[in-house]
Amino acid sequence: MSKSSDRINLTNQFLIAMPNMADPTFSGTVVYLCDHSERGALGLVINRPTDIDLESLFNRIDLKLEIEPLLHIPVYFGGPVQTERGFVLHEPVEGSSYNSSMTVEGGLEMTTSKDVLEAVATGTGPKRFLLTLGHAGWGAGQLEEEISKNGWLTVAADPRIVFDTPAEERFEAALGLLGVSSSMLSGEAGHA
């Protein structure tokens, strides 16, 4: 392995699953990488809505959500790790600090504490957010290995895809950042 100073940091990038993705958990997914270091990586799948909406989830955790446009926003499957835990990917809120937030270098924030949901419920929280149950995680070197085996494409993340693009269009929209579409991809790795 090269020196750590030569390492590529994929924080604030999208991982786009290649057609040959063997793991059905990640087939067809776009993952927003919140953290990538020599210790591993943590990300949130942004294009797998569940059957649970915000109203249902808030009721389960005894929060009253009365903001009509938010009631039926879906909760997403964020990945197979800690699926009972909520992860909120959101734009920074000026003047706010939540109990358990991580600022993604050059990008968004990820918060895991209930106070961000309380702020959303009262209309004082982030206006643009995506709530997931669970996250995706990779151990040291694991993600790099998957990328080297043609499992993922990477591209700089665009918050408009996370927050403004319908879930079913996010995969193609992320590929579009690279100037390609899924019809152009092959599951076979090649060498020129």
From Swiss-Prot:
Domain of life: Bacteria
GO cellular component, one term: cytosol
Alphabetized Gene3D superfamilies for the sequence: VC0467-like
Record InterPro entries: AlgH-like
Similarity remark: Belongs to the UPF0301 (AlgH) family.
Protein name, per record: UPF0301 protein BTH_I1462
